[in-house]
Design a protein with these regions (language model features):
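Beta-rich catalytic cores
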Residues: 26-28, 179, 223
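Active-site metal-binding motif and surrounding structural segment of the metallo-beta-lactamase
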Residues: 35, 39-43, 48-104, 215-235, ...
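Active-site metal-binding loops of divalent metal-dependent hydrolases
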Residues: 24, 45-50, 82, 107, ...
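Flexible loop/turn segments at secondary-structure boundaries
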Residues: 28-29, 52, 86, 111, ...
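Conserved beta-strand elements of the Class I
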Residues: 20, 31, 43-44, 184, ...
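Long, structured stretches of catalytic cores involved in phosphate-ester chemistry, encompassing
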Residues: 109, 219-303
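Alpha-helical scaffolding within the catalytic cores
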Residues: 26-29, 57-62, 88, 209-216, ...
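Flexible, acidic/histidine-containing loops and adjacent segments that form or flank the divalent-metal
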Residues: 2-19, 24, 64, 69-76, ...
Length: 359
């Protein structure tokens, strides 16, 4: 009998790249299923154990996802930067499932901000001890292959890594979002559909290091149909502060996104007020309101299926994953009820946002 995670998450065909933006409350976790020779590579970009506001318990979900599967391990864990809302629960995850390879930004935040960083170091050692890949992501002009997908590492640039590494710990920590990994992953031919994963990358990162270098030359490597909103819909993608008189939007001119995914709880539930109203207004200048998808709205996870010809659909799970795997309101320590919840109890039908191809 399949688990609910398998029913909802596993792609129905081997020639579909599936991208799942999971509801993890105040944090990020994006799961990729990447076609590769008749099977799928799996990649989890960032993680958060959103115990408040019913976030999905990633440990239970991932255990159920890989239970009884021939490919019973996570092929890649990718960390855009070592903040707890992007590397939360990492010790629990690596104890619960096998992780073959790890990619990361190479940021060392210093001893006063080391909890997520230390968990990442433990994973790096565990992976390398088994002969897996431990890769520090560095921005490059190259387009690389991953299974049957293509990808670009857009950030951090080598000179940014070197410069920030020479700073004292507190300055390094303040610049962590400038040092954030940014990746674009695409699938389909002749023109791939691209998903742009931005982590918490900020105005400085885009204005000073990413946009012109990767977007304004002969090849636009930031153009993407699906944009994951940076920093949970924070204004920091556009502004240095709320009263910044010169919001930066050049990156949006070149990304040209058709769809936006915001990973955050409801604004009134967010400890930072995400997504920020002024950021939403800027996004709406480029993206129609009905193509802006917010995980906090109904505690939904959004599922993007990209086909081999580049067409794609974005659907949602109707909040089913959060209902089935979400932390209960009184859960303080991340316990859960996997034994009571993990098995499927009936057929599952995904909610269609729009049955017409979106790309």
């Amino acid at each position: 009998m399949s688990t609910r995670a398998q029913e909802i998450l596993l792609p129905p065909q081997s020639n579909i790249m599936r991208v799942v933006f999971l509801y993890v409350a105040q944090g990020d976790a994006t799961l990729f299923f990447i076609p590769s020779g008749g099977r799928h590579l799996t990649m989890l970009i960032d993680s958060n154990q959103g115990r408040k506001h019913g976030g999905i318990n990633l440990v239970e979900l991932l255990q159920d996802l890989f239970e009884g599967q021939a490919n019973g391990s996570l092929t890649y864990y990718v960390n855009t930067h070592p903040h707890l809302d992007h590397a939360g629960g990492l010790d629990e995850i690596q104890d619960a499932i096998e992780i073959d390879n790890v990619w990361h930004s190479g940021h060392d935040p210093g001893r006063n901000h080391c909890e997520a960083y230390d968990a990442l170091q433990r994973l790096r050692k565990k992976v390398t001890d088994k002969g897996g890949e431990d890769r520090t992501l560095t921005g490059t002009r190259s387009t690389e292959l991953l299974g049957e997908a293509v990808y670009n590492v857009l950030s951090p640039a080598q000179h940014v890594q070197d410069e920030i590494a020479d700073e004292d710990p507190e300055v390094r920590y303040r610049r962590i979002h400038e040092h954030c990994a940014v990746l674009r992953i695409g699938y389909g031919a002749p023109v791939p559909a691209f998903v742009l994963i931005t982590g918490d990358s900020d105005k400085c990162a885009w204005q000073e290091h990413i946009t012109e270098y990767h977007g304004a030359g002969d090849e636009n490597r930031i153009w993407s149909q699906i944009l994951s909103a940076s920093h949970h819909g924070s204004r920091t993608f556009f502004k240095t502060s709320e009263d910044d008189p010169e919001p930066y939007t050049r990156h949006m001119d070149l990304i040209k996104p058709e769809n936006l995914i915001i990973s955050a709880p409801l604004q009134e539930e967010s400890c930072h007020g995400h997504p920020h109203d002024d950021a939403l207004e800027l996004y709406k200048k480029y993206i129609s309101e009905d193509a802006i998808f917010h995980t906090g709205d109904g505690r939904r996870s959004f599922i993007c299926d990209i086909y081999s010809d580049g067409r794609f659909f974005i659907n949602d799970d109707g909040g089913e994953l959060a209902e089935h795997y979400g932390f209960p309101p009184d859960d303080e320590d991340g316990g859960g009820g996997k034994e009571e919840r993990s098995k499927s109890t009936g057929p599952y039908v995904i909610s269609q946002i729009d049955r017409k191809p979106m790309g």
